[in-house]
Amino acid sequence: MGRTLESKKQIVKKIEDLLDNSEMALVLDYKGLSTKEMSDLRSRLQQSDGVCKVTKNTLMRQAIKGKNSWTGLDSLLTGTNAFVLIKGDVGSAVKAVQAFQKETQKSETKGGLFEGKLLSQDEIKAIAKLPSKEALMGQIAGALNSITSKIAIGINEVPSGLARSLKQHSENGES
């Protein structure tokens, strides 16, 4: 027996809520994946604030209707789709999906959408190569620490240089 209209509305509402909180969406062809493999993918995605949802394309169309930033997904809504919705560390989530696909050899990424722009396979791979949020924060912190160290050394050098000049001048004056 099919779903009731009320249950379909609830599903669409849940998807809308997920989309409202997501930065990126990937569309995967999940044909051939077992329940265990889907559970594995979902657990990998949880670590980077990603969610994998399997829903009918018509329900996803209803959820993206009227949402300008997500309407690009419409062109990917054919066949058997799983939707990976990412709200946190986009790079880590894409890496998790790609690692999963490499291990299982059963699913492929049809495409993705990031900030309203439809992404090609190459662009999705490029996102996966980006460093994680933690690594970027570490690099920024290191750069800021380097700048403050150089400023401190520079400020300290002015009086030291002045003292050396005065000492040299006084030695030259005595001779």
Curated annotation (Swiss-Prot):
Gene3D superfamilies: 3.30.70.1730, 6.10.250.290. GO terms for cellular component: large ribosomal subunit. Keywords: Ribonucleoprotein, Ribosomal protein, RNA-binding, rRNA-binding. PROSITE patterns: RIBOSOMAL_L10. GO terms for molecular function: large ribosomal subunit rRNA binding; structural constituent of ribosome. Belongs to the universal ribosomal protein uL10 family. This is Large ribosomal subunit protein uL10. It comes from Prochlorococcus marinus (strain NATL2A).
